């Protein structure tokens, strides 16, 4: 195509002012350097420019590791029309100027940004292809943990803040290998533009602009965030301008975009076609997080009830979404009806108004005190009207149907670790990720369905966003005088009962009939006792003389 003929010439000219004629600082033939354990260090702008010079000269660094060790701030270019950086990697063409040679001048190593921030880059080449921090990345190249702020990237074809083109090669050839772009972040003061230029037969289209990557070809982008201002003529997305892919016989895509989201408010396609909040032209996107077109900046994401098999676990998701407002779904979680108590621990706060609007009809309580006396552990609960992020609660869902996969709207995500509610003799501990008990544990208790409370008598997993009780001061469940033989759960004005162990079972049953009487060893009586002694009624010890 005519556009490509012009591109092959334009690339050589456009990057002239930002190019560095520096020899390699990274000897790829040295097996002891550039490993994952001893990566090549990018310590300053000169090192980054040297990497660009090497790759653009044909050194792909396949299998070599690089790590950014410091924040980098570029000085503004002499004029707005010029550039102060040459992208790492470029796309060249065969002699016919029609066939792209994606592998020839591509980065194929591993670049770890180390969470450091690169700012001030300006690339202004409106007639060039493959523009970004990395122009061209090819399998098995990996770019991860890079942060970008206050940067501007302008090209004509395949423009992205992190990478212009990310290519996996032949469809399916590397489908079981992780490569691509991971856990990168682009700030709101970054602009990405695929500009049109030229006229007539020499006109260049202004295609494929993305806040993270311009064109994702049979490759992967995972866990990335962008708030960039993105524009182009066509194929414009907050994360990717386009995703190209193929699928295996089972229909699974070889390329994917997963757990990424766009938090900006400006994605513009001047030709009014192929523009999306996440991706402009979608060939393959996993149905996961914020992947439908809609209002830019509105986040929707899913937390997994049991994330042990997930490629991205809840901790990573929470870290990616920290301090952002979102609609959050607890996938796989069910709040049971018919007056069943459920434990819950959420990574976001809810005001009293939100609790009323989204959780009604429910009763919400949290642990107030936990005391142990003469073989009886008493857990007292107090009413709550709002939810604190990371604090465990018990909740009684009183709706007519069970509430599966509950969604909470307009909440602000917190990645801070859950906090215990502590009592003298027991704590209430919330979790965001599945917890394995590791075997029998008589110093912990957990609530199950139908208001039944257990201790684990074998290895088991408590799923995410729940809570359990841990016993303090050496207290364990058992029949000895110094052990917990009976348990009282006091729900205030609700009926309260004693919990006692059934024979030959790890199961404890919560009896909650109003005004029932119990002996201290857990035997339920048929009515108020007439014999003198100490008894339990409505969660309190009563002395009858």
Feature map (PLM): residue ranges:
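Sec-dependent, cleavable N-terminal signal peptides
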Residues: 1-22, 513, 542-545
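A short, polar beta-strand/turn micro-motif
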Residues: 300-359, 380-452, 456-498, 502, ...
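Short, flexible beta-strand-to-coil junctions
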Residues: 164-169, 215-217, 242-245, 348, ...
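Surface-exposed repetitive/solenoidal architectures
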Residues: 20-360, 481
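Short, surface-exposed terminal/edge motifs of secreted or surface/virion proteins that either
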Residues: 146, 224, 260, 290, ...
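A glycine-anchored, Pro-Gly-centered beta-turn/N-cap motif
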Residues: 64, 109, 340, 389-391, ...
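C-terminal outer-membrane/trafficking sorting elements
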Residues: 495-545
């Amino acid at each position: 195509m005519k556009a490509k003929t012009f591109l092959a010439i334009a690339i050589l000219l456009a990057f002239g002012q930002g190019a560095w004629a520096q020899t390699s600082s990274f000897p790829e033939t040295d097996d002891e350097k550039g490993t994952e354990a001893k990566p090549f260090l990018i310590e300053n702008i000169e090192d980054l420019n040297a990497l660009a010079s090497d790759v653009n000269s044909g050194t792909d660094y396949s299998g070599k590791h690089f790590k950014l060790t410091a924040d980098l701030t570029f000085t503004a270019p002499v004029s707005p029309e010029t550039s102060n950086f040459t992208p790492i990697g470029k796309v060249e063409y065969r002699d016919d100027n029609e066939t792209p040679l994606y592998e020839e001048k591509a980065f194929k190593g591993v670049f770890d940004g180390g969470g450091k921030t690169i700012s001030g880059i300006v690339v202004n080449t409106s007639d060039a292809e493959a523009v970004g921090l990395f122009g061209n990345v090819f399998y098995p190249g990996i770019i991860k943990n890079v942060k970008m702020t206050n940067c501007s990237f302008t090209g004509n074809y395949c423009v992205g803040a992190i990478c212009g083109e990310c290519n996996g090669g032949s469809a399916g050839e590397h489908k079981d290998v992780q490569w691509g772009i991971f856990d990168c972040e682009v700030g709101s003061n970054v602009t990405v533009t695929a500009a049109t230029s030229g006229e007539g037969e020499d006109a260049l289209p202004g295609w494929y602009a993305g806040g993270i990557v311009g064109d994702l070809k049979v490759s992967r982008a995972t866990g990335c965030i962008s708030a960039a201002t993105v524009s182009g003529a066509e194929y414009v997305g907050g994360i990717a301008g386009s995703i190209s892919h193929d699928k295996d016989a089972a229909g699974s895509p070889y390329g994917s975009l997963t757990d990424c989201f766009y938090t900006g408010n400006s994605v513009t396609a001047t030709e009014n076609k192929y523009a999306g909040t996440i991706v402009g032209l979608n060939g393959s996107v996993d149905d996961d997080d914020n992947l439908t077109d809609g209002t830019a900046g509105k986040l929707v994401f899913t937390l997994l009830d049991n994330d042990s098999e997930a490629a991205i676990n809840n901790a990573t998701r929470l870290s990616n979404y920290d301090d952002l407002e979102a609609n959050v779904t607890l996938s796989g979680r069910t709040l049971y009806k018919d007056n069943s108590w459920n434990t819950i621990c959420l990574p976001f706060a809810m005001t009293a108004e939100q609790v009323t609007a989204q959780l009604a009809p429910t009763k919400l309580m949290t642990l107030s005190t936990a005391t142990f006396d003469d073989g009886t552990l008493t857990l007292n609960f107090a009413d709550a009207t709002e939810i604190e992020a990371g604090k465990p609660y018990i909740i009684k869902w009183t709706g007519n149907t069970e509430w599966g996969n509950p969604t909470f709207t307009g909440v602000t995500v917190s990645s801070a670790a859950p906090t215990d509610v502590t009592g003298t003799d027991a704590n209430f501990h919330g979790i965001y990720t599945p917890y394995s008990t590791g075997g029998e544990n008589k110093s912990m208790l957990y609530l199950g369905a139908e208001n039944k409370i257990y201790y684990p008598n074998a290895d088991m997993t408590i799923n995410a966003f729940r809570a359990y009780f841990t016993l303090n001061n050496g207290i364990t469940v058992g029949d000895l005088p110094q052990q917990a033989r009976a348990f009282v759960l006091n729900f205030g004005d609700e009926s309260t009962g004693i919990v006692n162990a059934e024979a030959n079972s790890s199961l404890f049953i919560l009896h909650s009939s109003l005004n029932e009487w119990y002996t201290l060893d857990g035997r339920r009586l048929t009515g108020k006792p007439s014999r003198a002694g100490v008894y339990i009624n409505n969660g309190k010890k009563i002395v009858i003389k």
